Amino acid sequence: GLFWLKEGENTIGGAESNDFVFPHAEASLGKVILKNNQVFYNNEVIYSSDDKFSVISQQSLRWFIIKRGDKFAIRLRDLEGEYLKAFHGIDHFPADSKWKIKAKFIPTVGKKVTIIDITGRSYQEDSPGLLEFQVDGKTYRLEAGPGETKEDFFVVFGDATNKTSTYGGGRFLDTKGFNPDGTVTLDFNKAYNPPCAFTPFATCPLPTKENKLTLAIPAGEKNAGHH
C-alpha cells in the first residue's frame, strides 16, 4: 500500500474509521505525525532523511516512510500479500554481448532534469551527464542520473520493446565506474524492472523524453507480467 500523509496526525489500523486502513491489522495502531519535515510514531522519530528512517514490523506487515518531492507517504508491505504469493520469477532475454556497450560520457555540470513518476508527480533531479553510444551505426544518448558513487550512474530508459515484451513504463540500469579509456559500460543485459512493474503502489520514475529510445533493446529482464 501507499498512503500520502497530511501535516499533523494520521491514524492507522485495521478499522475503517482510520485515515489509513491496514490489512490484517489491529483496529488501531496509533497515529503517524508529520511535523516540520519529520515523521513521528509512538513519540519516536521514524523519518528524518532518506538515510535515517525506521522500518516498523507488525505481524506480517512492514512499513516505513518515503519522501517524494515535498510529500511524505507510508510505504506498506504485507509479507503474506497476494502479490508475493503470485510471484514466480522473472524471464530474461538470453545474454548477448551486442548489448554490452561502451558509452562516451558527456558531462552536464549543474544541469537539472524534470522527472515525472508513475503517479504523475514531478520533481527536479541532478543530471551529471549524457551517455552517448552507438548501435548498428546509429548514435543514441541517455540522460544519466546519480548512482551509488560519483562515478556510478542510474539510468531510467524506454525502448521499442516496451510495447511488446518488456514493461511499458521502461526499465532501470545501473553503471559501475569508468573504464580505463574514460568510457562507461552500458550492459543492457542487466536492465531490470522498476518496482511499479510488480505493484500499483510504487512511485517509480518514468523515462524522460531524451531517454525514450526508438530502437528495440531485447536484453535484460522481460515484463514480469504481474501488474
Task: Give, region by region, the residue ranges found by the protein language model.
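Short strand-coil-strand connectors
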Residues: 42, 59, 134-138, 158, ...
